[in-house]
């Protein structure tokens, strides 16, 4: 079955027909064909995509990406620990909110949604507060589309011997990185993002030695990261609780298609081409980006809403959907915006078609 429209969102996103077709078969969760030949292969492939170093392991977790963020924060910090969170968007704020719900000691550095983290403030905070044990940041903050300075963040954190937690939900698989070279302890991402699978589970790629120190720290039964890893390690990929089999099989197919595309580097280049073509085309139609180009990621871009009193996002959305494209509302608290993603099964020719569609559905007076 073909899609009626293209999802220009940061995930869930448009998937290939072959990824969707992979879900048409049922699987038994205790069968070796599923656990050894699919789950274990996925775990191995993900680690190899993340780093060339051998001291990392992978845990798959049922649920949304946020569930795995909560599993990580709730499983790796002991009662005497303290978390520092960088919050320059909704997803950084969500990590701080998770820490609050878990009654964790937490300090938040919040430079604002359109501002990059203040690295000098991060350095001084770590220097002046020795109680901080863990630091967390979102790599690609899809609230705005900003790409945060991952290398500098990791360098500063490790200079102070802190455990690093990176939400790479919307970057892993679409932006090249080696988490071993960056010395990241825990990196979290999701099936329905740049690997181009479907929703249903997320995953954590962790330094095995650091993860092994987390036994008994979890504040939740189902979100116990260590227990999930231990079960998979000792039982050839078996999940502790019901595995989302169809989603997992689709993800396996998505990984094969990433390899066929040429790997993360080639996919990143496609995303970059998509994003640059998108921004150029939108500016030609009179739209303005929220962020300067230097801060953009190749994942999703925020645009200011037109100033015309005739403009209404919902109407714009409905007209574009009828033309075959679905976009995203804004999430910035202090600016009226909307967002357009360019990841997933999206190619430069799709962006060309989008520009034609937007030009055709503009019903408001465009400012000169």
UniProtKB/Swiss-Prot annotation:
Q: What GO MF terms are annotated?
A: 2-aminoethylphosphonate-pyruvate transaminase activity
Pfam families, alphabetically?
Aminotran_5
User: What's its EC?
Assistant: 2.6.1.37
Gene Ontology BP, a term: organic phosphonate catabolic process
Q: Which reaction does it catalyse?
A: (2-aminoethyl)phosphonate + pyruvate = phosphonoacetaldehyde + L-alanine
Keyword Transferase in the entry? The reply is: yes
What does this protein need as cofactor? pyridoxal 5'-phosphate
Alphabetized UniProt keyword annotations: Aminotransferase, Pyridoxal phosphate, Pyruvate, Transferase
- Entry's SUPFAM superfamilies? PLP-dependent transferases (SSF53383)
PTM sites of type N6-(pyridoxal phosphate)lysine:
193
Gene3D superfamilies assigned: Aspartate Aminotransferase, domain 1 (3.90.1150.10), Type I PLP-dependent aspartate aminotransferase-like (Major domain) (3.40.640.10)
User: In UniProt terms, what function does this protein have?
Assistant: Involved in phosphonate degradation.
Family per UniProt?
A: Belongs to the class-V pyridoxal-phosphate-dependent aminotransferase family. PhnW subfamily.
Question: Which HAMAP family does this chain map to?
Answer: PhnW_aminotrans_5
| Record text on subunit structure and interactions | Homodimer.
Q: Kindly provide the name given to this protein in its UniProt entry.
A: 2-aminoethylphosphonate--pyruvate transaminase
Which organism's genome codes for this protein?
Answer: Psychromonas ingrahamii (strain DSM 17664 / CCUG 51855 / 37)
């Amino acid at each position: 079955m073909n899609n009626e429209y293209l999802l220009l969102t940061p995930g869930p996103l448009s998937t290939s027909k072959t990824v969707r077709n992979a879900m048409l078969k049922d699987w038994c969760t205790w069968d070796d064909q599923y656990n050894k030949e699919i789950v274990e292969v996925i775990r191995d492939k993900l680690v190899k995509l993340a780093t060339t170093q051998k001291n990392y392991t992978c845990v798959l977790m049922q649920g949304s990406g946020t569930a795995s963020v909560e599993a990580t924060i709730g499983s790796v910090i002991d009662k005497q620990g303290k978390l520092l969170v960088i919050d320059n968007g909704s997803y950084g704020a969500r990590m701080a909110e998770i820490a609050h719900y878990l009654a964790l000691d937490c300090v938040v550095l919040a430079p604002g949604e359109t501002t990059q983290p203040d690295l000098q403030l991060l350095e001084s905070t770590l220097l002046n507060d020795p109680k901080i044990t863990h630091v967390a940041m979102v790599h690609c903050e899809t609230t705005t589309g900003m790409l945060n300075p991952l290398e500098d963040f990791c360098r500063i954190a490790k200079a102070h011997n802190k455990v690093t937690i990176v939400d790479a939900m919307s970057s892993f698989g679409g932006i090249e990185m080696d988490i071993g070279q960056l010395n990241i302890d825990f990196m979290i991402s999701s099936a329905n993002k740049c690997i181009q699978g479907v929703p249903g589970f997320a995953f954590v790629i962790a330094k095995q030695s650091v993860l092994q120190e987390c036994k008994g720290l979890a504040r939740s039964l189902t979100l116990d990261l260590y227990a999930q890893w231990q079960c998979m390690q000792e039982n050839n990929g078996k999940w502790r609780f019901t595995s989302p089999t169809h989603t997992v099989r689709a993800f396996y197919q998505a990984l094969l298609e990433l390899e066929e595309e040429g790997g993360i580097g080639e996919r990143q280049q496609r995303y970059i081409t998509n994003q640059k073509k998108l921004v150029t085309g939108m500016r030609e139609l009179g739209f303005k980006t929220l962020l300067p180009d230097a801060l953009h990621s190749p994942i999703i871009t925020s645009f200011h809403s037109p100033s015309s009193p005739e403009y209404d996002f919902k109407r714009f959305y409905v007209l574009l959907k009828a033309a075959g494209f679905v976009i995203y509302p804004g999430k910035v608290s202090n600016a009226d915006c909307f967002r357009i993603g360019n990841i997933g099964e999206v190619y430069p020719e799709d962006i060309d078609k989008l520009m034609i569609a937007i030009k055709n559905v503009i019903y408001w007076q465009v400012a000169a």
